[in-house]
Amino acid sequence: MFIERKALYRLLDLNRSDVLISAPQKKQESSVELRANLRVLPATATFVAKYRVRLLAISALILIPCFWHRHIEAGDLGSHLYNAWLAQLIEQGHAPGLRIAHPSTNILFDYLLSGLAKIFGLLIAEKISVALAVLIFFWGAFALITATTRRAPWLLTPLIAMVAYGWTFEMGFFNYYIALGLSFFALAILWPGTSRGSSREWAIAIALIPLIYVAHPLGVIWLIAAAAYIRVASLIPPRFQVFLVAVAAGVVFLLRLYLSRNFVVDRAFDPLYLFNAGDQLVLFGDRYKIVEALCGIFIVIAIAADVIARRRESGFWRAYLIPLELYVIAEIAVFLLPDGVRVPNQPAALALITERLTSLSAVLVCCVLGAMLPRKWHLLALAGIAAVFFTFLYQDTALINRMEAEVAALVKTLPPNQRVLATILKPDESRVLVQHIVDRECIGRCFSYGNYEPASGVFRIRAQPGNKYAMTDFEDVASMEEGDYKMLPEDLPAYQIYQCNEDWTELCIRPLAADELNDRLGVHP
């Protein structure tokens, strides 16, 4: 439980040298002058060589949550791993009725997972794949903040780490997560002044676009939109940039009209004002709102203190301008765009868009904070908040690990290769789904009959009617997860894992019968 506290103390030591100030510095060069004097690749090589020990140490620290439990508890991750196992069975000819498709997007993490599994096995591949995803997201955000401010955001690393382990990570949306991280790297290269005149650097940024698309299309949309906005904004005097924000808002509104007229759309259930970037830190319960509030207080005080201290410094506010404008536009998108978009007659939707967008908002807040002159109290305050956040996260993921161990014990009581359904509902105050712990524990033991990926028609594992391993109707899968799926004779034999008393973490297993609802005996507080 105290691992993360020691890690934060180490982070404090790493950041003391040559980055801490306690009094206003002499007037800085303008951000435009600094950008014009910088070439990305040589500057990056010099930076990495100079700070390689620090970079390695910080990388090791931010990966601690990937290794502090037996399993990484991150929503859809269990489903990703389970379907990687199904892919192995299909390749070996052991899963008739299932096939492997080759979608062009939303698949990069799955390819990474399967490729590593062939070398290291599934469980080790899971750790390596998630660790790589975290490093891509964290250092991508770090690079983007550096590009926006021409200053390495060492003192913001606790905040970046919290965002890296925020809602998007805990939901297990790793294809989207990697797409964002790669897009941050590309945008850092394309930031005005950093790659001007260097065709090689432009080529690197452009070459990332296909890789980002294979990860998730939203990453490409964000990258192109942000790069275009930044390029135009850099050519417009600051006093006119408010009109550019208005134009961007109009484009978002037109996109909303297009989506609503051509697709089936849904709105977010929660009030939209809650999705302000801080929601990325609200995970398994209301106590995370303490972390959100502390971060909000820090942001207000830190920016106010910086503005007051630098009020006589000509043009200091320009470093704030474009990151703040991008944040405002991202929040306009949160308010205007639908939460879910589905093609008519297609079973699965691109869902939770509102919540996903706040990952961008959170990183853009970090970019805004990067414009401040760094002061040692920034690191002290953020390290303290991060200690609270990661303590909560350790405790909650430890609880889910214990639930998963209970699932493992339950499925071991079954004959091999049985169909298993599960209805495990999260508490109302939690924003993170947990039902996919059953998927992971079925690997090599049973078949998670209600896993949503084969029936969705958008992932690489596809189920054909009459197969023994997976449901084929997406609506049936949704009903099963809610516990009101009526069992058919052809679904049997099958077993239900369910919450069996008022303690939502206590699980039981039982055989199912034809014509009964799968979660008939479930108890949900």
List each model region and its residues.
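Transmembrane-helix signature of polytopic, membrane-embedded enzymes
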Residues: Y9, V48, A57, A141-A164
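Transmembrane catalytic cores of multi-pass membrane glycosyltransferases
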Residues: F67-H80, G93, A101, T105-N106, ...
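Short hydrophobic/aromatic helix or loop-helix immediately within or flanking a transmembrane segment
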Residues: Y82-L86, R99-L122
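Transmembrane-helix motifs of polytopic, lipid-linked glycan transferases
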Residues: I128-T148
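Short acidic/glycine- and proline-prone juxtamembrane loop motifs at membrane-interface regions
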Residues: M171-I178
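Membrane-interface transmembrane helices that cradle and orient dolichyl/undecaprenyl
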Residues: A186-E201
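Signature aromatic-anchored transmembrane alpha helix within multi-pass, membrane-resident enzymes
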Residues: G370-Y394
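Short periplasmic/luminal acceptor-recognition loop of GT-C membrane glycosyltransferases, typified by
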Residues: I400, L410-W504
